[in-house]
């Protein structure tokens, strides 16, 4: 977990979490264990909002009383009174609800929040929760408990609240939120992604004091990426007279986590526009099938979409957009397999980058390894990579250490997208192998490692240098591409008329459709050639001759292409030394059993490759000229894959046989000595 100077670690949040979960003892027996989180979380958020409003409570109530009968819209007046974009006009608070009419008073208290704050509790179905607590006789006690803890942002920062929430999720897992693992991005990963995204624009921020830029996270969860990015630029005040301003936007699928993010944004203000309600830009819904920011673009994007999650629930809308809008929509390049929608978010972010003429856009997205290489040439995954690379949108990919996520130990990768690359990065992708940049921490779920401040700084410096080194490669994007060619070889086959062939003929559908009388005519003709070996082209003249002979005898039989194919299937025997089979036009017939494929680097001519790599071993091989790419119409289908091992592989020579032999003899001696001791006892 990131532990910057302005941030408490997750462990520092434990005293608060211990207090909150002491409330579970008051719930035990009346509520299921699985309900605890859904009860406690909204109370946590309520108390946090209450702590912020407490200093101006009397001023707001007095102002509301003075203006409510005037008929004017007093919303702006009350916001100015609180110095925040929300307010509450009730005289109640958690500490003065009373023990006799607690439920009615609490419901009245919630109802007097401004609309943008009240929606938070609606998403938790808080009204029903209050009724259940009241019936169980514990509502007053829970309210009193929370009234005694200070959750003001000056006491408990946004990061600690986010860490706290995620700690509680890990403690109760899916019982609190079935999609919990989808949004829990460790703070160290968030901070690294933010630094890589924003630091390249230092010069822009320095030359434009107070520059306003938009920020977007399509999978915003509790808002960790958004708040961290905003805090990151706020720290620029140490260097710049007026730091830049990021205006956050986000979308979240899960109502509960959306509510947490709403709370976080309600409590944040922009120095340039203190009354602005940042929570209005945090939307609820599925980003893939219900984009709440359609046709909008952003200067900066951050995202950690779920790993390996099916997108079948969104498939109808996504497929329709792909087919109807094509490249005018988000998913024009292609669609991945249904079992992993992470590449759809990659395309979604690319579509959200601000246009270069408006300052351009940059994005950072955390993905598993699958989007690097899943899918062969012409597959949806490969076509997505192709579009991103050929349009020069991929600036860098960072391989992160394993075991840095809470719910998985798999390898993860941080992609940096940009449509405003500087000259040294054009047409190139920087690969950074940061798998060794970590320090050990106390286990938190599957998380055993962290990218600390020093390691983060090293990675950012490596990225900024944009040079080749032991852990960095600047790669021409075409090096990731290949052209998959279909390699054919001639069919070399003789026709051997024997009992084995006759038995196989019985299984051919064309034979089975014949009448018994016609079958007998063909059998009589074939038996005249029993034991003979013929060229492959013999079948057609034989059939024609048999048809004529039957006709002369007053019998009408037919021998079309299907029947001749049945004869060659039944009696054909491959003959490596035979002549290639030719079709009616004199063209070589390919042997389907010898068909093979070769992936030829895009930077190489396919015929040169064939001559060097294939023909020395298979002199009769040739390229199928009809196997073409759908887009460029050239022979061979284009594919792209990004294989880190190819660029960072280190050869480790095997140990010398003498060393291995000596070690084995030593072990044998030790075993013999142990056995001798046992024998003497």
Functional labels for PLM-detected ranges:
Residues 406-504:
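Flexible, glycine-/basic-rich loop-and-beta segments that form/coincide
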Residues 179, 183-303, 308-319, 343, ...:
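Conserved S-adenosyl-L-methionine
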Residues 1-7:
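Short, exposed "boundary/linker" segments that immediately precede the start
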Residues 144, 240-243, 276-283, 323-329, ...:
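Short acidic (Asp/Glu) and glycine-rich catalytic loops that position anionic groups and cofactors
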Residues 20, 32, 36, 40-48, ...:
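Conserved Class I SAM-dependent methyltransferase catalytic core
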Residues 45, 51, 55, 267, ...:
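Short, well-ordered loop/turn and helix-capping segments at boundaries between secondary-structure elements
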């Amino acid at each position: 977990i990131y532990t910057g100077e302005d941030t408490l670690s997750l462990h520092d949040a434990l005293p608060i979490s211990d207090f909150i979960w002491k409330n579970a003892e008051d719930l035990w027996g009346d509520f299921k264990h699985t309900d605890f989180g859904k009860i406690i979380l909204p109370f946590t958020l309520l108390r946090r909002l209450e702590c912020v409003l407490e200093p101006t409570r009397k001023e707001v109530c007095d102002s509301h009383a003075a203006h409510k009968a005037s008929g004017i819209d007093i919303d702006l007046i009350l916001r100015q009174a609180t110095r925040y974009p929300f307010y509450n006009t009730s005289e109640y608070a958690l500490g003065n609800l009373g023990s006799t009419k607690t439920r009615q008073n609490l419901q009245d208290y919630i109802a007097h929040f401004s609309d943008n704050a009240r929606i938070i509790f609606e998403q938790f179905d808080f009204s029903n929760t209050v009724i259940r607590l009241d019936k169980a006789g514990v509502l007053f006690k829970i309210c009193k408990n929370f009234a005694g803890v200070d959750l003001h942002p000056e006491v408990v920062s946004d990061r600690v609240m986010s860490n706290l929430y995620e700690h509680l999720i890990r403690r109760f897992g899916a019982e609190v939120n079935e999609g919990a693992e989808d949004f829990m991005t460790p703070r160290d990963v968030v901070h690294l992604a933010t630094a890589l995204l924003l630091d390249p624009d230092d010069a822009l921020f320095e030359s434009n004091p107070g520059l306003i830029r938009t920020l977007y996270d399509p999978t915003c969860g509790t808002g960790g990426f958004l708040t961290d990015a905003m805090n990151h630029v706020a720290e620029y005040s140490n260097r710049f007279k007026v730091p830049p301003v990021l205006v956050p936007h986000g979308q979240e699928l899960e109502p509960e986590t959306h509510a947490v993010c709403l709370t976080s944004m309600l409590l944040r203000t922009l120095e340039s526009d203190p009354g602005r309600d940042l929570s209005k830009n945090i939307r609820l819904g599925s980003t893939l099938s219900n984009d709440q920011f359609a046709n909008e673009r952003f200067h900066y994007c951050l995202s950690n979409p779920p790993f390996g999650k099916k997108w079948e629930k969104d498939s109808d809308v996504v497929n329709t957009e792909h087919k109807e809008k094509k490249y005018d929509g988000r998913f024009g390049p292609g669609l991945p397999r249904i079992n992993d929608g992470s590449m759809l978010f990659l395309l979604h972010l690319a579509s959200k980058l601000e246009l270069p003429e408006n300052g351009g856009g940059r994005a950072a997205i955390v993905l598993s390894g699958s989007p690097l290489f899943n899918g062969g040439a012409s597959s949806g995954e490969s076509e997505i990579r192709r579009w991103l690379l050929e349009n020069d949108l991929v600036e860098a990919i960072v391989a992160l250490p394993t075991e840095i996520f809470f719910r998985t130990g798999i390898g993860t990768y941080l992609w940096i997208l940009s449509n405003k690359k500087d000259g040294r990065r054009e047409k190139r992708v920087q690969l950074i192998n940061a798998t060794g940049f970590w320090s050990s921490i106390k286990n938190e779920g599957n998380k055993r490692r962290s990218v600390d401040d020093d390691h983060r700084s090293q990675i950012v410096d490596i990225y900024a240098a944009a040079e080749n080194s032991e852990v960095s490669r600047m790669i021409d994007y075409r090096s990731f591409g290949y052209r998959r060619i279909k390699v054919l070889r001639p069919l070399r086959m003789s026709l051997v008329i024997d009992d084995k062939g006759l038995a196989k003929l019985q299984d051919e559908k064309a034979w089975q459709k014949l009448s018994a009388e016609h079958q007998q005519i063909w059998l009589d003709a074939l038996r005249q050639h029993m034991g003979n070996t013929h060229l492959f082209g013999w079948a057609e003249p034989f059939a024609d001759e048999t048809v004529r002979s039957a006709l002369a005898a007053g019998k009408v039989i037919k021998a079309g292409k299907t029947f001749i194919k049945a004869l060659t299937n039944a009696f054909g025997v491959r003959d490596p030394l035979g002549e290639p089979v030719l079709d009616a036009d004199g063209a070589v017939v390919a042997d389907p059993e010898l068909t093979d494929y070769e992936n030829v680097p895009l930077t190489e001519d396919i015929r040169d490759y064939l001559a060097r790599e294939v023909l020395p071993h298979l002199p009769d091989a040739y390229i199928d000229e009809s196997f073409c790419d759908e887009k460029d119409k050239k022979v061979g289908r284009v594919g792209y894959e990004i294989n880190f091992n190819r660029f960072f592989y280190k050869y480790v020579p095997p140990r010398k046989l003498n060393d291995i032999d000596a070690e084995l003899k030593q072990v044998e001696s030790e075993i013999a000595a142990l056995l001798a001791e046992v024998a003497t006892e």
